[in-house]
Protein backbone atom coordinates (compact mmCIF):
# COMPACT_ATOMS: atom_id res chain seq x y z
CA UNK A 1 0.00 0.00 0.00
CA UNK A 2 1.63 3.31 -1.02
CA UNK A 3 1.98 6.10 1.48
CA UNK A 4 2.47 9.75 0.53
CA UNK A 5 5.08 11.91 2.22
CA UNK A 6 3.85 13.40 5.45
CA UNK A 7 0.85 11.09 5.57
CA UNK A 8 0.10 9.27 8.81
CA UNK A 9 -2.16 6.27 8.18
CA UNK A 10 -3.69 4.52 11.19
CA UNK A 11 -5.64 1.29 11.34
CA UNK A 12 -3.78 -0.78 8.74
CA UNK A 13 -3.84 -4.48 9.47
CA UNK A 14 -1.35 -7.13 8.44
CA UNK A 15 -1.72 -10.87 8.86
CA UNK A 16 1.32 -12.49 10.46
CA UNK A 17 1.64 -16.28 10.26
CA UNK A 18 0.98 -17.97 13.62
CA UNK A 19 0.15 -14.60 15.19
CA UNK A 20 -2.99 -13.43 13.39
CA UNK A 21 -3.97 -9.89 12.41
CA UNK A 22 -1.82 -7.06 13.76
CA UNK A 23 -2.63 -3.35 13.43
CA UNK A 24 0.16 -0.87 12.69
CA UNK A 25 0.66 2.80 11.93
CA UNK A 26 2.18 3.75 8.55
CA UNK A 27 3.97 6.98 9.44
CA UNK A 28 6.50 7.58 6.66
CA UNK A 29 7.02 7.19 2.96
CA UNK A 30 8.54 3.88 1.86
CA UNK A 31 11.35 4.05 -0.77
CA UNK A 32 10.44 2.75 -4.21
CA UNK A 33 13.34 0.25 -4.36
CA UNK A 34 12.23 -1.74 -1.30
CA UNK A 35 12.06 -5.45 -2.12
CA UNK A 36 11.60 -7.02 1.31
CA UNK A 37 10.53 -6.25 4.84
CA UNK A 38 10.72 -7.89 8.24
CA UNK A 39 8.13 -8.05 11.00
CA UNK A 40 9.42 -8.35 14.57
CA UNK A 41 8.14 -8.03 18.11
CA UNK A 42 10.34 -6.54 20.84
CA UNK A 43 10.45 -7.51 24.50
CA UNK A 44 7.86 -4.86 25.32
CA UNK A 45 5.33 -6.65 23.11
CA UNK A 46 5.42 -4.00 20.35
CA UNK A 47 5.30 -5.04 16.70
CA UNK A 48 7.60 -3.39 14.15
CA UNK A 49 7.70 -3.52 10.36
CA UNK A 50 11.21 -2.86 8.99
CA UNK A 51 11.70 -2.29 5.26
CA UNK A 52 15.09 -3.19 3.77
CA UNK A 53 16.45 -0.04 2.13
CA UNK A 54 19.92 1.51 1.94
CA UNK A 55 19.71 5.31 2.22
CA UNK A 56 22.10 7.53 0.30
CA UNK A 57 25.10 8.81 2.31
CA UNK A 58 25.10 12.40 3.48
CA UNK A 59 27.58 14.44 1.41
CA UNK A 60 30.17 16.48 3.28
CA UNK A 61 29.70 20.26 3.44
CA UNK A 62 33.04 20.84 1.70
CA UNK A 63 34.26 23.33 4.30
CA UNK A 64 37.30 21.26 5.32
CA UNK A 65 36.34 21.34 9.00
CA UNK A 66 37.45 18.52 11.31
CA UNK A 67 35.67 17.70 14.56
CA UNK A 68 36.82 15.51 17.43
CA UNK A 69 34.31 13.71 19.63
CA UNK A 70 35.10 12.59 23.17
CA UNK A 71 32.47 10.13 24.39
CA UNK A 72 31.85 9.70 28.10
CA UNK A 73 29.29 8.97 30.79
CA UNK A 74 28.67 12.39 32.36
CA UNK A 75 28.79 14.02 28.90
CA UNK A 76 27.67 11.69 26.12
CA UNK A 77 29.60 13.54 23.40
CA UNK A 78 31.93 16.51 23.86
CA UNK A 79 32.93 18.21 20.60
CA UNK A 80 36.21 19.97 19.89
CA UNK A 81 34.11 23.05 19.09
CA UNK A 82 33.23 23.29 22.78
CA UNK A 83 29.73 21.84 22.54
CA UNK A 84 28.62 19.36 25.21
CA UNK A 85 25.93 16.95 24.03
CA UNK A 86 24.05 14.73 26.49
CA UNK A 87 21.89 11.78 25.52
CA UNK A 88 18.47 12.20 27.16
CA UNK A 89 16.70 9.43 29.01
CA UNK A 90 13.38 8.77 30.64
CA UNK A 91 11.78 11.72 32.46
CA UNK A 92 12.14 11.76 36.23
CA UNK A 93 8.70 10.35 37.01
CA UNK A 94 9.15 7.46 34.61
CA UNK A 95 12.57 6.70 36.10
CA UNK A 96 11.00 6.58 39.56
CA UNK A 97 8.25 4.30 38.28
CA UNK A 98 10.87 2.01 36.72
CA UNK A 99 12.71 1.71 40.02
CA UNK A 100 9.45 0.94 41.85
CA UNK A 101 8.59 -1.75 39.32
CA UNK A 102 12.04 -3.32 39.64
CA UNK A 103 11.62 -3.51 43.42
CA UNK A 104 8.16 -4.99 42.94
CA UNK A 105 9.60 -7.55 40.54
CA UNK A 106 12.17 -8.64 43.12
CA UNK A 107 9.34 -9.36 45.60
CA UNK A 108 6.99 -11.05 43.13
CA UNK A 109 6.61 -14.82 43.19
CA UNK A 110 8.24 -16.60 40.26
CA UNK A 111 5.75 -17.93 37.74
CA UNK A 112 2.90 -15.75 39.00
CA UNK A 113 0.70 -13.66 36.72
CA UNK A 114 1.60 -10.56 38.72
CA UNK A 115 5.29 -11.10 37.97
CA UNK A 116 4.54 -11.36 34.25
CA UNK A 117 2.58 -8.09 34.33
CA UNK A 118 5.41 -6.29 36.13
CA UNK A 119 7.97 -7.63 33.65
CA UNK A 120 5.88 -6.36 30.73
CA UNK A 121 5.58 -2.92 32.34
CA UNK A 122 9.36 -2.80 32.88
CA UNK A 123 9.98 -3.86 29.28
CA UNK A 124 7.72 -1.06 28.00
CA UNK A 125 9.61 1.58 30.00
CA UNK A 126 13.01 0.24 28.94
CA UNK A 127 11.82 0.13 25.35
CA UNK A 128 10.78 3.77 25.60
CA UNK A 129 14.22 4.62 27.02
CA UNK A 130 15.89 2.82 24.10
CA UNK A 131 13.70 4.72 21.62
CA UNK A 132 14.76 8.05 23.15
CA UNK A 133 18.42 7.04 22.93
CA UNK A 134 18.13 5.89 19.31
CA UNK A 135 16.33 9.08 18.32
CA UNK A 136 19.11 11.19 19.87
CA UNK A 137 21.82 9.18 18.10
CA UNK A 138 20.04 9.50 14.75
CA UNK A 139 19.59 13.27 15.03
CA UNK A 140 23.10 13.88 16.41
CA UNK A 141 24.83 11.74 13.76
CA UNK A 142 22.88 13.48 10.99
CA UNK A 143 23.84 16.92 12.33
CA UNK A 144 27.53 15.99 12.59
CA UNK A 145 27.61 14.45 9.11
CA UNK A 146 26.08 17.63 7.66
CA UNK A 147 28.37 20.07 9.51
CA UNK A 148 31.85 18.53 9.24
CA UNK A 149 33.98 17.00 6.49
CA UNK A 150 36.04 14.77 8.82
CA UNK A 151 34.80 13.25 12.08
CA UNK A 152 37.35 11.77 14.48
CA UNK A 153 36.49 9.54 17.44
CA UNK A 154 38.42 7.40 19.88
CA UNK A 155 38.91 3.75 18.95
CA UNK A 156 37.02 2.38 21.95
CA UNK A 157 36.15 -1.29 22.42
CA UNK A 158 32.69 -1.02 23.97
CA UNK A 159 32.35 -4.78 24.42
CA UNK A 160 35.53 -4.98 26.49
CA UNK A 161 34.66 -1.86 28.47
CA UNK A 162 31.27 -3.27 29.50
CA UNK A 163 32.46 -6.78 30.31
CA UNK A 164 31.06 -8.18 33.55
CA UNK A 165 33.25 -7.98 36.66
CA UNK A 166 31.65 -10.97 38.41
CA UNK A 167 34.60 -13.26 37.74
CA UNK A 168 34.39 -16.95 38.64
CA UNK A 169 33.76 -18.99 41.77
CA UNK A 170 37.50 -19.54 42.16
CA UNK A 171 38.39 -15.91 41.42
CA UNK A 172 35.41 -13.67 42.24
CA UNK A 173 35.46 -10.13 40.91
CA UNK A 174 35.78 -6.92 42.89
CA UNK A 175 33.44 -3.93 43.05
CA UNK A 176 30.91 -5.90 41.01
CA UNK A 177 27.93 -3.63 41.76
CA UNK A 178 29.88 -0.47 40.95
CA UNK A 179 31.12 -1.96 37.68
CA UNK A 180 27.61 -3.10 36.76
CA UNK A 181 26.33 0.44 37.32
CA UNK A 182 29.12 1.87 35.16
CA UNK A 183 28.36 -0.66 32.42
CA UNK A 184 24.71 0.44 32.39
CA UNK A 185 25.68 4.10 32.06
CA UNK A 186 28.15 3.36 29.24
CA UNK A 187 25.51 1.45 27.30
CA UNK A 188 22.83 4.04 28.05
CA UNK A 189 24.97 6.87 26.67
CA UNK A 190 24.70 5.38 23.17
CA UNK A 191 28.40 5.83 22.40
CA UNK A 192 28.58 2.71 20.23
CA UNK A 193 25.37 3.40 18.31
CA UNK A 194 26.41 6.99 17.60
CA UNK A 195 29.62 5.91 15.86
CA UNK A 196 27.87 3.16 13.89
CA UNK A 197 25.35 5.65 12.54
CA UNK A 198 28.17 8.05 11.65
CA UNK A 199 29.81 5.27 9.62
CA UNK A 200 26.52 4.70 7.80
CA UNK A 201 25.75 8.36 7.09
CA UNK A 202 29.29 9.64 6.44
CA UNK A 203 31.23 6.71 4.93
CA UNK A 204 34.88 7.53 4.30
CA UNK A 205 34.78 10.58 6.58
CA UNK A 206 35.06 8.90 10.00
CA UNK A 207 38.52 8.35 11.47
CA UNK A 208 39.52 6.59 14.69
CA UNK A 209 42.28 7.74 17.05
CA UNK A 210 44.07 5.70 19.70
CA UNK A 211 42.49 6.68 23.04
CA UNK A 212 45.74 6.57 25.05
CA UNK A 213 46.36 9.78 27.04
CA UNK A 214 43.89 11.92 25.10
CA UNK A 215 42.44 13.01 28.45
CA UNK A 216 45.84 13.80 30.03
CA UNK A 217 47.43 15.73 27.17
CA UNK A 218 47.11 19.50 27.00
CA UNK A 219 45.55 20.49 23.69
CA UNK A 220 47.43 23.82 23.80
CA UNK A 221 51.05 22.86 24.55
CA UNK A 222 51.05 19.05 24.31
CA UNK A 223 52.28 18.45 27.89
CA UNK A 224 51.12 15.12 29.34
CA UNK A 225 50.46 14.72 33.06
CA UNK A 226 47.86 12.70 34.94
CA UNK A 227 47.53 15.49 37.52
CA UNK A 228 46.43 18.02 34.91
CA UNK A 229 42.95 16.54 34.98
CA UNK A 230 41.86 17.80 38.37
CA UNK A 231 38.31 16.40 38.15
CA UNK A 232 35.88 14.84 35.75
CA UNK A 233 35.04 18.25 34.28
CA UNK A 234 38.17 20.39 34.87
CA UNK A 235 41.51 20.26 33.04
CA UNK A 236 44.32 22.59 34.12
CA UNK A 237 47.68 22.05 32.41
CA UNK A 238 50.53 21.68 34.90
CA UNK A 239 52.95 23.23 32.37
CA UNK A 240 51.22 26.16 30.67
CA UNK A 241 48.20 26.68 32.91
CA UNK A 242 45.69 26.19 30.09
CA UNK A 243 42.28 25.67 31.73
CA UNK A 244 39.16 24.34 30.04
CA UNK A 245 36.59 21.59 30.22
CA UNK A 246 38.34 18.22 30.43
CA UNK A 247 36.09 16.56 27.85
CA UNK A 248 36.53 19.43 25.38
CA UNK A 249 40.31 19.23 25.87
CA UNK A 250 40.22 15.51 25.03
CA UNK A 251 38.00 16.18 22.01
CA UNK A 252 40.52 18.73 20.67
CA UNK A 253 43.31 16.17 21.02
CA UNK A 254 41.16 13.69 19.11
CA UNK A 255 40.43 16.27 16.41
CA UNK A 256 44.16 16.89 15.99
CA UNK A 257 44.81 13.13 15.83
CA UNK A 258 46.91 13.36 18.99
CA UNK A 259 47.38 10.15 20.92
CA UNK A 260 50.41 8.66 22.60
CA UNK A 261 51.57 5.09 22.19
CA UNK A 262 52.78 2.91 25.06
CA UNK A 263 56.39 3.76 24.08
CA UNK A 264 55.73 7.48 24.23
CA UNK A 265 55.56 8.14 20.49
CA UNK A 266 52.83 9.97 18.66
CA UNK A 267 49.76 8.01 17.69
CA UNK A 268 48.22 8.50 14.29
CA UNK A 269 44.58 8.69 13.36
CA UNK A 270 43.64 5.79 11.14
CA UNK A 271 40.81 6.06 8.63
CA UNK A 272 37.80 3.78 8.73
CA UNK A 273 35.72 2.87 5.66
CA UNK A 274 37.69 5.11 3.34
CA UNK A 275 35.72 4.18 0.24
CA UNK A 276 35.17 7.16 -2.07
CA UNK A 277 31.67 8.57 -1.97
CA UNK A 278 29.87 8.71 -5.31
CA UNK A 279 29.29 12.45 -4.87
CA UNK A 280 33.04 13.00 -4.50
CA UNK A 281 34.17 10.99 -7.54
CA UNK A 282 35.82 13.12 -10.24
CA UNK A 283 33.81 13.60 -13.38
CA UNK A 284 35.35 12.48 -16.65
Where are these regions (language model features)?
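Hydrophobic alpha-helical hairpins/lids featuring a short glycine-rich hinge
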Residues: 1-14
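"…together with the soluble PPM/PP2C metallo-phosphatase catalytic core" -> "…together
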Residues: 10, 17-20, 32
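Trp/Tyr-centric glycan-recognition "aromatic platform" motifs on solvent-exposed beta-strand/loop surfaces
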Residues: 14, 21, 45-48
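Beta-strand/loop nucleic-acid-binding surfaces
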Residues: 20-28
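Positively charged, helix-rich recognition surfaces that bind polyanionic ligands
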Residues: 28-35, 41-284
Amino acid sequence: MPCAAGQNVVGIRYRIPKAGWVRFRWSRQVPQDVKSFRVTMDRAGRWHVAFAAVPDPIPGPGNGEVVGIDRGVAVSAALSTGELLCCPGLPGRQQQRLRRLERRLARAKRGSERRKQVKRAIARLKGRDADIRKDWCEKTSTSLACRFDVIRVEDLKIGSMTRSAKGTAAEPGRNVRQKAGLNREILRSGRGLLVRRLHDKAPGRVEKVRPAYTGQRCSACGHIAAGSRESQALFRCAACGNTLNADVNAARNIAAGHAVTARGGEGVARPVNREPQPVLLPTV
